[in-house]
Design a protein with these regions (language model features):
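Alpha-solenoid helical repeat scaffolds
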Residues: 8, 55, 76, 90-94
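Short terminal alpha-helical segments
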Residues: 1-37
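Eukaryotic acidic, Ser/Thr-rich intrinsically disordered low-complexity regions
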Residues: 80-104
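Acidic, low-complexity, intrinsically disordered interaction modules
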Residues: 30, 34-86
C-alpha cells in the first residue's frame, strides 16, 4: 500500500453520490471501506512499520459513523486485529480517537 493507493480510495469515497440512490451509495461505500481494510491488514502482515497504515486508519475512521459501521469496522476489524496482535493499541487508539460517531 502506498500513498497513491490511499489517494485513490479517498477519491472513490469522496465521489460517492449520497443524494441519488442511497442504497447504491451505501453499497459503494462499504466496498471501498472493505478494500481499505484489506489494504490495512495486508500491510500489517507485510510491512508493519509502514507509515501508510496510520494514514489508512485515519481514512477509515473518518468514513465510519453510524452504528452499523462501528460494528463492522470497530468490532469486527480493528478489535480483531488488536486481538491477533497485528494492530498495536496505539494504532487502534488512533482509529478510535478520529471516528465521527453519529446516529443513523
Amino acid at each position: 500500500m502506498n500513498n497513491t493507493d490511499l489517494f485513490y480510495l479517498k477519491q472513490k469515497l469522496e465521489s460517492i453520490d449520497w443524494n441519488a440512490d442511497f442504497e447504491k451509495a451505501d453499497k459503494e461505500n462499504y466496498e471501498v471501506l472493505d478494500s481499505l481494510c484489506g489494504y490495512i491488514e495486508k500491510e500489517l502482515r507485510n510491512n508493519a512499520q509502514s507509515e501508510t497504515i496510520e494514514a489508512a486508519l485515519l481514512l477509515l475512521a473518518q468514513n465510519v459513523g453510524c452504528a452499523e459501521d462501528f460494528e463492522r469496522y470497530e468490532d469486527n476489524f480493528v478489535n480483531r486485529l488488536v486481538d491477533k496482535g497485528l494492530l498495536s493499541k496505539e494504532r487502534a487508539k488512533l482509529f478510535y480517537n478520529n471516528t465521527n460517531r453519529r446516529q443513523g
